Amino acid sequence: TASRRLVVHGPGGWTEVRELEPEPREFDIQRIDGLPPSQVTPDPESLARIRREASQVRKARQHLDDRIDFADGFVWPVHGPITGVYGSQRILNGQPRSPHWGVDLAAPTGTPVVAPAAGVVTLAHPGMYFSGGTLMLDHGLGLSSAFLHLDEILVEPGQRVAQWDLIARVGATGRVTGAHLVWRMNI
C-alpha cells in the first residue's frame, strides 16, 4: 500500500503535513445475484447517463467552507441491521465489480431517514441509475454524507438541516434487491 500525504491548512496560514501509511486489510466478499443484466453491464446510453450523474455527485462534493457542522458527532440516519459493509468486494450476477463505498442499513420502504449531523443539502436527485433517490449533505471542511436508494427526499439543495432533522425516507430505488439505505461519507 502506498503512503499518502495529508496536508491541512488552518486559519492564519498555518500548515500541517503528515505522511500516512495505510495498513493492508482484507475485505468481505458479497455475492449479489438476480439483478437485471442492465444493472450489471449497462448499455452505452446508460453509461453516458451514469457518467453525467457521477459528474453531478463530484460537483456536489466540491463545496468547501469553514463550517464544522460535524462537531457534535454523528448519529445513525436509520436504525436497522447492517447488511453490507464499506469496502466489501461486490460480485454482481457472478461478475466482479467495484467495491462497496458505503454501509447498508436494512429498513422497510418509508422508514424515516434523519440527518446524522447538521449540514447543507448539496444534491437531491429523485432517481439516479445505480443509486436511485440520492441525497447529499455537506457537513463542512469538505466532509459530506450521501444517502442512496431513497423512496422520498424531503429537503432541497441549499437547505440547511440540523442533526436529527427528517430528510428522507428509505426506499428500494436504483440497483437494489430490497429496501435499504446506503450511507456514504467522503472527505
PLM-predicted stretches and their roles:
Residues 1, 185-187:
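Short, intrinsically disordered, charge-balanced linker/junction segments flanking boundaries
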Residues 1-25:
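Cationic-aromatic interfacial patches
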Residues 12, 128, 167-175:
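Short, charged beta-turn/beta-strand-edge "cap" motif at the junction between a beta-strand
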Residues 12-14, 111, 141-144:
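Short acidic/polar mixed-charge low-complexity motifs
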Residues 19-131:
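Surface-exposed, glycine-biased beta-strand/turn segments
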Residues 85, 108, 124, 150-153, ...:
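Residue-level recognition of beta-strand microenvironments
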Residues 112-123, 154-170:
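Short, well-structured beta-strand-loop connectors
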Residues 116-154, 179-184:
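Zn2+-dependent peptidoglycan hydrolase active-site motif and core
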